[in-house]
Amino acid sequence: MVQITKGKFDGLQRLSNDKGVIAALAIDQRGSLKKMIQQAKGTENKKDVEDFKQLVSEELTPYASAILLDLEYGTPAIKARHEGSGLLTSYEKTGYDATTPGKLPDLIEDLSALRIKENGGDAVKILVYYDPDEPAEINEIKYAFLERIGAECRAVDIPFFLEPITYDAKVTDSGSLEYAKLKPAKVKASIKEFSKPRYGVDVLKLEVPVNFKYVEGFAEGEVAYTQDEAARHFEECSDLSPLPFIYLSAGVTSEMFHKTIQFANQHNVQYSGVLCGRATWADGIEVYGKQGDDALREWLRTQGKENITSLDKLLDEGAVPWWTKYGSFEDVHVVEKQ
């Protein structure tokens, strides 16, 4: 049995579908989305980013249990979301200071967990870049930072979703074969660390532990892992986490993310859903940039809808309810926050 405070429990339920699976859409990208729209449209305008997010939210949240948004460009999209769709809100600043070692995280100055909750957020989401092999003087800053977020979320009784993005300080190309060989150990180390109760994380938003571009049978060139090795990494990560976890799409294509989730399903991985971003809507950026709002709306109602509903089917086949890590639904004991 596990005890969960009422605010956290209610938030998790609002973010989940009727099976307890988090089938969520992510569009909290800020700097990267601004650049993509600018390249497609040839102009830079905050309203373009807001409008794109709003259209995606309006058209696709009927097929998502929740949406992840930011308050910098996402307020119109928050208002436009489907009535039954929960809301995760980003708390961290976009990107990191490249002039300082360690990819250190920072928070949006005029935001707090309380303000996120007051704004209708059902959960706080934090992204942190993490290399378990970096010096302690860098990682201790990140650990203390996340301990503070966990305490803040506990204080206002809102779920804390943590997204650790792994990297290697010495191997700068995260898409390389060299990094692909390091990635499984990095992801496992991040699960071990951030599952510790001291951080107060409720759900881990995880990268898949391998780069599918280098998995035998998926790779077009060099191979970093056999399919059996890839399956073992998935299973070990699943077993390592005492917390519910969901997968992020990490900028891959819709086709590749679908194959990834199929692979997880085939190997009985205990994941509780996805937060899928660019894999669902990225191809709509070119349409929006060149042809405008109406063309994007049409794309979202056809290809965008197909991307998200076909992913929903895969989740129906393989994802487990968020409470599975604690046993059954009856094993979750909801208590009032003291």
Swiss-Prot record:
Gene Ontology biological-process entries: 6-sulfoquinovose(1-) catabolic process; D-tagatose 6-phosphate catabolic process; lactose catabolic process via tagatose-6-phosphate
Class of the enzyme per the UniProt entry, highest EC level: lyase
Name of the coding gene: lacD
Enzyme Commission code(s) on record: 4.1.2.40
Protein name: Tagatose 1,6-diphosphate aldolase
Species in which this protein is naturally found: Listeria innocua serovar 6a (strain ATCC BAA-680 / CLIP 11262)
Gene3D superfamilies, alphabetized: Aldolase class I (3.20.20.70)
NCBIfam families the UniProt entry points to: PRK12399.1 (NF009065), PRK12858.1 (NF009498)
Record keyword Nucleotidyltransferase present: no
